């Protein structure tokens, strides 16, 4: 019950003409099979080693050199009417609200942002967790894997925390850096390793137009710069305030210069 063949036969038995269409891609990642394969290779979820990203005209992939840079880029995409969100690995505590405000748990250097609202809670001026990806106010919170899974948005910023480190040509997991409550002490290292890699796979595949990545660990960030040719840079538009754009990769229509 529920298979394509069953539904086709049921429709034909009721006098319907059936046309079967194969869906070769997905809306996520612009339908880019290359990007989805690249993410699997990057995270060590198949037998291939990580490779450099090669633009395919479907998906934009770039590196941010700071969380501030990523945040500004994501906010600008939101101001253009696109959906744009930041997510991160579960490497920071997820506090209850301090009165009527969220706690800035996700901190990197002098930068910080709060996680999204917990599912069972409500905070003024912030969307509930199930609306985080669609409510425009969600751009001001960092989403975790439990909130981001099953959703998609146009631009996807991903902060790779210290639980995933690039060493000797591959990513390795450091479970001691994870704050995920799903990993109590008795859980086997192999299970934790797989779950953390899968969590980043979820985070890296939410974007429809493009993904921006930043790694907390300096060595990991340097490797990402090597594997991803596109970076976020500064460009002026007709004397206006500078806007963050992509250097090293083709600018998509969403933020190409418009004359007039």
Would you name each region that the model predicts?
Residues 1-9, 37-42, 98-116, 172-176, ...:
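Short secondary-structure boundary/capping segments
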Residues 1-27:
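ASCE P-loop NTPase helicase motor core
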Residues 253-254:
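Intrinsically disordered, low-complexity segments enriched in serine/proline and basic residues
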Residues 19-21, 25-35, 43-152, 156-164:
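Conserved helicase/translocase motor-coupling segment
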Residues 11, 43-46, 207, 211:
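Conserved NTP-handling cores and scaffolds of large molecular machines
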Residues 136-241, 245:
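C-terminal accessory regions
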């Amino acid at each position: 019950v529920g298979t394509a063949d069953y539904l086709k036969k049921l429709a034909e038995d009721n006098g319907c003409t059936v046309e079967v269409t194969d869906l070769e891609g997905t809306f996520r990642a612009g339908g880019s099979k290359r990007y989805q394969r690249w993410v699997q290779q990057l995270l060590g979820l198949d037998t291939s080693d990580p490779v450099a990203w090669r633009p395919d005209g479907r998906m934009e992939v770039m590196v941010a050199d700071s969380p501030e840079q990523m945040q500004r880029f994501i906010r600008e995409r939101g101001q253009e009417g696109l959906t744009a969100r930041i997510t991160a690995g579960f490497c920071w505590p997820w506090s209850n609200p301090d009165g009527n405000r969220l706690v800035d748990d996700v901190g990197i250097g002098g930068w910080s942002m709060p996680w999204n609202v917990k599912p069972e809670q409500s905070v003024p001026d912030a969307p509930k967790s199930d609306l985080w990806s669609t409510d425009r106010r969600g751009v001001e919170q960092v989403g975790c894997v439990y909130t981001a899974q099953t959703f998609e948005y146009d631009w996807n910023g991903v902060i790779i925390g210290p639980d995933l480190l690039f060493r000797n040509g591959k990513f390795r997991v450091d479970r001691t850096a994870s704050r995920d409550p799903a990993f109590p002490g008795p859980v086997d290292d192999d299970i934790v390793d797989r779950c953390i890699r899968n969590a980043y796979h979820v985070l890296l595949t939410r974007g429809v137009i493009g993904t921006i990545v930043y790694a907390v660990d300096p060595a990991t960030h340097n490797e990402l710069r090597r594997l991803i040719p596109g970076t976020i840079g500064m460009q002026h538009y007709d004397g206006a305030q500078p806007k963050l754009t992509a250097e090293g990769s083709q600018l998509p229509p969403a933020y190409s210069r418009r004359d007039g």
